[in-house]
Amino acid sequence: MKKVIIMAALLISCIFYAQEVQPKYEVVGNEVKATYFHDNGQVKQEGNYLSGKLQGKWISYNENGNKVAIGEYNNGVKVGKWFFWTDDTLNEVDYTGNRVADVRKWSKEALVKN
């Protein structure tokens, strides 16, 4: 009976381990493109590394695949304009030297539709 329980526990742990979504890394030129995933398999985050530091555009998504953040890194430091989406709000955050320099918020109703 002990052997059956041990085998069942081992089998279950193997099944759960196999279902874990592992990050994907791909060498592109002198950078490494990284893609991270939510438990449901949807892309969570994607961007590049250069010399082990975050570099260039990074995009984050929620579990449903909707974009929730986009911004730029330079040598591991947040730079320029970053955009963060929540339910009804778009936040624009300006970074200078990895520090927040300015924040602007727009509600869904304030955005112009064409």
Language-model region placement:
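Positively charged n-region of N-terminal signal peptides that target proteins for export
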Residues: 1-4, 19
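Sec-dependent N-terminal signal peptides
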Residues: 4-13
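Glycine/tyrosine- and acidic-biased, solvent-exposed loop/turn segments at the edges of beta-strands
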Residues: 14-114
